[in-house]
């Protein structure tokens, strides 16, 4: 039995675009999670050539699919080495004693030298680190990385990859690179009638067939087009069917998007700590996204229960009422959060 899985990645919480220079390593533009005016101009000047077909585009041939939960034991933590090297090095340092670390980078020698150099905590032992050369657009691998699914509940591990909801073609194929490197089949929701656009920051699984999302998943799969793509066209029922067919999700909890949250990822304000516990941001009364968050959680409590048939436990944590603060996102590598 295989009881570990490949983490879909880690999100580093920086929302500004900047030039990063640390010691002798200088990195280029670091794009924010949402595509801004400057990045769009770069994309349009270079042209966009997405890889439309990739992975296995038919449903996994298993009858007991289970999408892994983030807190389960992991085999490896995946990192996109694209900006913020000092922080990424600290993440590697904290993780290498807990699990294997797989780093995607456009310059393996530079990344290796930085990890073994004296800056930001000193030299690291790379025995438990795999460095893979890979073209990248951004750091946000939590959003575009692969999802671990078991075909036979705890055996027959596969990776499931969606259409990424950003015009970043290099990022969108990282899951295929990971699958090839590890020898794991990658099933992709890239072909009709199973085409589905989604992002890791807007998906949480309890490991027992229940998933949480904002209604962004409906908005981005209801047809139409924008400046860079034509969206898949499905009803909410069809969307839920694709999640069940590829990932074994049989209870799909969606919540209205928030009025002030620009990217509408649920991990901006909540975290599923285990199969029965929610960590949720709490704003001052009547402030910002607080009322909608409270309404969403109340709806969850009124209409859904845990795997065990009990009410979800909710832990509220104080959130800043304005831009510039943090939110309860994290990545996990075994006991390290």
Predicted regions and their residues:
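Bacterial N-terminal signal peptides that target proteins for export
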Residues: 1-10
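Bacterial N-terminal signal peptides
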Residues: 9-21
